[in-house]
A protein has these predicted regions:
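Conserved alpha/beta core of the MobA/IspD/sugar-nucleotide pyrophosphorylase nucleotidyltransferase superfamily
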Residues: 261-296
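Conserved N-terminal catalytic core of the sugar/cofactor nucleotidyltransferase
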Residues: 154-213, 225
Length: 296
């Protein structure tokens, strides 16, 4: 289902499978305000909107898309009931207007609803990229090794681009620091020996964040879409979140704000994993299809 407006004229609704289209709203200059002065046309919802939703509820398909649900639909009780029937029978991806209307708030507050605010999809999430390894197994600094024509470190920089309110790379290596500065990414350059030092240093400046993702810098096959999924599901959540593939856990890991103080005071040589073991009931996973994303 798709609806759209012609400003100053009308609103239309189309059933995408059949292509049938009806008018469901008409411009009314007598309405208050300067925009969206549309009044509902109940006959359009009765002719197509309600029957189309009920047909979709019984299609041989898992997903149904509805773009969009707004104030016109909020005044149509029959359409609302048909939408509830659809939700009971299908998984629905819907665009819902951000307006203080009862039906729209009902949809977004359902226990089975996963809501993404398109104006602020990821929220106040920080990112710490841990790039302090000494490369003993590799024999040299593997983060500077060529991977697809660029230093390996660049892969995690790309995978975390454009998602986080604050992003910082914690490293012992001047060359990595230089690469990050060239890309205008914040860097903490240090000479401290332990993993807990990296975690503590990374959390500096994250006071305004409500959660923080910690990502190893040596997972070059990690995709940006996967990082974004972690950021999305963790928004507004009190849980720790990590990736998993076929029951095998992996990184990155998102830690909520209530863990920050404990992360800053980890035992010497320990990382955030100690908290995941301490609070197993507060851990959730995002399952991914391709285990290669977790490989270092």
């Amino acid at each position: 289902m798709t609806s759209w407006a012609k400003p100053g004229q009308a609103v239309y609704l189309r059933e995408n499978l059949s292509g049938e289209t009806v008018q469901v709203g008409a411009f009314d200059p007598s309405l208050p305000g300067t925009a969206n002065r549309m009044k509902s046309l109940p006959e359009g919802f009765t002719k197509l909107g309600i029957p189309a939703l009920l047909r979709c509820a019984h299609l041989d398909t898992l997903w149904v898309t509805v773009d969009e649900v707004g104030y016109l639909e909020s005044g149509m009780e029959g359409y609302q009931q048909a939408f509830r029937t659809l939700l009971e029978n299908k998984q629905v991806a819907a665009v819902v207007r951000k307006q203080p209307l009862a039906f729209l708030q009902e949809l977004c507050s359902r226990k089975d609803a996963f809501v993404v605010d398109l104006d602020d999809p990821f929220g106040k999430i920080g990112c710490v990229i841990m790039a302090s390894g000494l490369g003993r197994r590799f024999g040299s600094n593997k983060l500077l090794a060529d991977f697809g024509g660029e230093p390996m470190i660049c892969r995690i920089l790309d995978a975390t681009e454009g998602i986080f309110r604050r992003r910082v790379v914690v490293t012992r290596h001047e060359e990595i620091a230089r690469l990050c500065r060239e890309r205008e990414i914040s860097v903490v350059l240090h000479s401290l020996p332990n993993r807990n030092d990296t975690v503590r240093l990374g959390l500096q400046g994250m006071e305004e964040m409500d959660r923080c993702l910690f990502a190893p810098a040596d997972q070059p096959l990690l995709r940006r879409e996967t990082v974004a999924a972690l950021a999305l599901v963790s928004k507004g959540s009190p849980y720790c979140w990590r990736l998993s593939c076929e029951g095998v856990p992996g990184s990155p890991v998102v830690f909520p704000e209530w863990t920050f103080e404990q992360l800053k005071n980890l035992p010497e040589g320990k990382g955030g994993g100690i908290l995941l073991k301490k609070y197993p009931e507060r851990l959730r996973t995002v399952n991914i299809r391709d285990g290669y994303e977790l490989q270092d």
